[in-house]
């Protein structure tokens, strides 16, 4: 089993792959064709973020297994051949190794987690993958940006900047068709930039005054409730 440092699209890839999005609140998985089309419904499951890294790896592997076992006919056929799995995860990801370089406490114990190896071993043990399984892991916003640059809003553009607001605030940069990771895998990240508006608001990283402390989805909702008295 291997991890990949492929560019946005491996032009030699013709078989479907499984795409997985791992966020702080949910895990979504789908079978995707080589041209980026969905081959069935998106399977979603809650992220056991407070149960630790191993529980999250279990949930990722379970989502992929369920998709292949009970998904569209194309998903069931993929069991008969080596399957590639692409995972976009919350946190700062060493994409070359498929390991979490650093992360906030949104997912307990996530820093240092070998996502690629952990998921590959679980899928092999479950009998839904072979030793030839290719697993590629990147930051979730990097993966999102790669998709937008390939066949989305940024298709045809030389450079693409993506800003994503969800449980946290993330950013990614695509240059000349490749995700730009930077020296420490942080290129494009803006959630933990200082923000004068944030003041002393606590951030999920343990510090205060960062953009994410006021601009992440939960914080937008909280600030709205505080300003309006809404419940």
Where are these regions (language model features)?
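Glycine-rich phosphate-binding loop and adjoining helix at the ATP-binding site
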Residues: 48, 53, 57-58, 80-85, ...
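N-terminal basic/disordered segments at the start of proteins
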Residues: 13-32
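Residue-level signal for well-ordered, solvent-exposed loop/turn and beta-edge residues enriched
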Residues: 25, 37-38, 99, 178
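Short, low-complexity, intrinsically disordered N-terminal peptides in bacterial proteins
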Residues: 1-16, 35, 66, 72-80, ...
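Active-site glycine-centered loops adjacent to acidic/histidine catalytic or metal-binding residues
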Residues: 21, 140, 166
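N-terminal phosphate-binding loop and adjacent alpha-helix
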Residues: 40-77, 112-114
